[in-house]
């Protein structure tokens, strides 16, 4: 269970000139996000100076984390950038920072709170910055799934493996039931470890990362995988299907990566002869199978860094990152385009904008703790256990 808190530390409250733009302060408000179109317009440039001034006033008391999918206007104020796990570890390595401002989404801030010290306070600039995929697996649904596995007589054979992109509750469930967490970079190692512990894996919440890793990296077949739908009785599966399966995949997906299609790949190859198609493993299996290269966000960045001048690339991942990489490598003559013709970005990531960041930094600078993300101790203990198992992977 996670609580989001707004606490006044000073009897003189900070004037909140920047409102929350009418958004609900509900981290679980985003479910099944549809593509909202092109990126929002840049925020008022006058806010840049306000953000800079507030950050300078806070000094070493604040450490700002910026996920790769954040807007440029926000990333410019990040002390470090990276994927969710790297950022959580970076925060833990800065114990002198009283405030960790996480420019990302809710589950990321939870992970940072789990890995940082008790005296550090993790803040999310907009509490409505949730994650539709993380919300696709609730603690109640996963507990019910475990009951189904128990009734099928296989629970003792199953090891849960949860993607980093999951809530603290799901990470805790995983830790409590002998499982581990994985990232898109180490999913193969996590599965290898899990199959040393048991005969089957319950992979959640992203079906595509689980399927792609099992088939592409582990040599399994699509028939070895079954899809558990939490909205159907018994997950829509028979006991016989569960007993025969090696991989029990949760019916969850990323709303952005799930939009890329086989048609997207075919179209870009027709439009740009000689293009290299590079996609994230959260994409559908047929997209991954049709791509030239597949890898995590960090893999994508390193691949483009190493790419020769004049090469052409179509990238299947979040739009903010693709645009940033296209601009970065344009002087080297590398042509980088978004894989799909329909422009789409992660709308929940983009809830963290410059007005919210300014409001957060100015509030903290005036002594007002806002939008704190705090995981309860029992949940934290089991979630940390699952994360520690991941850290111990070879």
Provide a role label for each language-model segment:
Residues 2-316, 320-394:
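Active-site loop-to-helix "anion-binding N-cap" substructures in soluble metabolic enzymes
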């Amino acid at each position: 269970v996670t609580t989001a808190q707004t606490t006044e530390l000073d009897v003189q409250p900070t004037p909140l000139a920047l409102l929350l733009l009418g958004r609900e302060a509900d981290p679980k408000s985003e479910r099944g996000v549809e593509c909202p179109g092109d990126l929002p317009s840049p925020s008022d440039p006058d806010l840049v100076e306000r953000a800079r001034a507030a950050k300078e006033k806070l000094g070493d008391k604040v450490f700002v984390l910026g996920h790769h999918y954040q807007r440029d206007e926000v990333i410019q104020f990040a002390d470090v950038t990276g994927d969710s796990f790297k950022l959580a570890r970076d925060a833990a390595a800065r114990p002198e920072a009283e405030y960790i401002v996480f420019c990302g989404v809710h589950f990321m801030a939870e992970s940072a709170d789990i890995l940082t010290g008790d005296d550090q306070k993790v803040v999310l600039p907009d509490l409505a910055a949730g994650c539709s995929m993380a919300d696709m697996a609730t603690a109640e649904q996963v507990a019910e799934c475990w009951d189904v596995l128990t009734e099928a007589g296989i629970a003792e054979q199953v090891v849960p493996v949860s993607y980093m992109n999951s809530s603290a509750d799901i990470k805790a469930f995983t830790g409590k039931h002998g499982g581990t967490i994985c990232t898109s970079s180490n999913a193969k190692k996590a599965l290898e470890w899990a199959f040393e512990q048991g005969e089957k894996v319950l992979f959640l919440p992203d079906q595509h990362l689980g399927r792609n890793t099992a088939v592409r990296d582990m040599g399994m077949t699509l028939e070895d995988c079954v899809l558990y739908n939490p909205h159907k009785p018994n997950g829509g599966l028979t006991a016989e299907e569960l007993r025969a399966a090696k991989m029990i995949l949760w019916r969850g997906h990323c709303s952005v990566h799930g939009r890329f299609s086989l048609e997207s790949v075919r179209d870009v190859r027709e439009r740009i002869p000689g293009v290299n198609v590079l996609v994230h493993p959260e994409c559908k299996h047929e997209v991954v199978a049709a791509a030239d290269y597949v890898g995590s966000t960090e893999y994508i960045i390193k691949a483009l860094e190493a790419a020769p001048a004049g090469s052409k690339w179509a990238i299947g991942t979040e739009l903010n990152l693709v645009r940033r990489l296209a601009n970065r490598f344009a002087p080297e003559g590398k042509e980088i385009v978004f894989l799909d013709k329909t422009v789409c970005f992660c709308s929940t990531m983009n809830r963290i904008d410059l007005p919210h960041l300014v409001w957060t930094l100015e509030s903290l600078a005036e002594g007002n703790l806002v939008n704190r993300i705090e995981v309860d101790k029992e949940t934290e203990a089991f979630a940390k256990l699952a994360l520690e198992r991941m850290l111990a992977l070879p």
